[in-house]
UniProtKB/Swiss-Prot annotation:
It comes from Microcystis aeruginosa (strain NIES-843 / IAM M-2473). This is Small ribosomal subunit protein uS13. It holds the Pfam family Ribosomal_S13. Located at the top of the head of the 30S subunit, it contacts several helices of the 16S rRNA. In the 70S ribosome it contacts the 23S rRNA (bridge B1a) and protein L5 of the 50S subunit (bridge B1b), connecting the 2 subunits; these bridges are implicated in subunit movement. Contacts the tRNAs in the A and P-sites. Part of the 30S ribosomal subunit. Forms a loose heterodimer with protein S19. Forms two bridges to the 50S subunit in the 70S ribosome. The keyword Ribosomal protein applies. The gene is rpsM. GO terms for biological process: translation. InterPro entries: Rbsml_uS13_C (IPR027437), Ribosomal_uS13 (IPR001892), Ribosomal_uS13-like_H2TH (IPR010979), Ribosomal_uS13_bac-type (IPR019980), Ribosomal_uS13_CS (IPR018269). GO terms for cellular component: cytosol; small ribosomal subunit.
Length: 127
């Protein structure tokens, strides 16, 4: 089983697609890695030789920041924004949209599910 950066690649998929299971590697970066290492993109992961896997692993780990390192780098950038008190950092901390989207309506993904507010109760009518 091919294991790169602590992630097991799916055995039955093409290498080009399987590399996208790594955080920080999309289709274009996957194609770039395969052309640089000389591995055929149509090869299935289970058919890769140990040398191919080693070549992919070393190329990716030396040239790109992926998985835990990339997640840590992103988290540190967000934390830095919050620590220096920027508007963006505050929006991140409050869980609101960061890039200027409206929040009066929409923004449900960032704000979470609706919290229903009870309507005003009607006073009992006197008869």
């Amino acid at each position: 089983m091919a294991r790169i950066a602590g992630v097991d690649l799916p055995r039955d998929k093409r290498v080009e697609i399987a590399l996208t299971y790594l955080y920080g590697v999309g289709l274009s970066r996957s194609q770039e890695v395969l052309s640089a290492t000389g591995v055929n993109p149509d090869t299935r992961v289970k058919d890769l030789s140990d040398e191919d896997v080693a070549a992919l692993r070393t190329y990716i780990e030396t040239n790109y920041q992926i998985e835990g390192d990339l997640r840590r780098w992103e988290a540190m950038n967000i934390k830095r924004l919050a620590d220096i008190g920027t508007y963006r950092g505050r929006r991140h901390r409050l869980g609101l949209p960061v890039r200027g989207q409206r929040t009066r309506t929409n923004a449900r993904t960032r704000r979470g599910r609706r919290v229903t507010v009870a309507g005003k109760k009607k006073a009992p009518s006197k008869k």
